[in-house]
Each structure stands twice: as structure tokens, then as C-alpha cells.
Amino acid sequence: MPKRILQGKVVSDKNEQTVTVLVERRFKHPLLHKTVRSSKKYRAHDADNQFKVGDTVRIVECAPISKTKRWTVLTETAEVSA
């Protein structure tokens, strides 16, 4: 089974070797047909403590590292400003 890759923004880097990433998804409401935004926070492993608050990163699913960490930071993505 392939590993999931998500993209989100770092909202906390206070813990050692851990960042909290806010991932937002958009979907169409089945009844109202309106675009709805939903967000979820994931705790990801950052071995070198290189990512700071506000960075946009990609995280990949991995084996459990601790009680709450099941994701690892893959890379930092450059935001495209339109």
C-alpha cells in the first residue's frame, strides 16, 4: 500500500524533534453544493529541528515513532505567490 503524502503549514515547533503541521482540505458539501474547508493537525518527526513556524512542508506517513507521531517531514515546499 502506498504511503500518503500531505502538504501543510507548520504551526508549532516547540517540541524537540517534532513539528505540528496544519493540513487543510477542501471538498464540496454533498447537500448544499458549497465548498467547505476542513483542517486537521498532524505531529511529524523533524530530526534536525530545521523547520520553523510558518514553513510550508510535505509530510509522509511512516511507522509509529511515538504515541502521537506517525508522520515524517519530507521536504519544505516553496510557496508560489500569485
Curated annotation (Swiss-Prot):
Q: Which Pfam families match?
A: Ribosomal_S17
Q: Mind naming one GO cellular-component term on file for this protein? A: cytosolic small ribosomal subunit
Q: Which GO terms fall under molecular function for this chain's record?
A: rRNA binding; structural constituent of ribosome
**One GO BP:** translation
List keywords of the entry alphabetically.
Ribonucleoprotein, Ribosomal protein, RNA-binding, rRNA-binding
Highest taxon of the lineage: Bacteria
The record's note on quaternary structure and interaction partners says: Part of the 30S ribosomal subunit.
- List, alphabetically, the HAMAP family matched: Ribosomal_uS17_B (MF_01345_B)
Q: Which family does it belong to?
A: Belongs to the universal ribosomal protein uS17 family.
The protein's job, in short, is: One of the primary rRNA binding proteins, it binds specifically to the 5'-end of 16S ribosomal RNA.
| Protein name (Swiss-Prot/TrEMBL) | Small ribosomal subunit protein uS17
The record lists the organism as: Paracoccus denitrificans (strain Pd 1222)
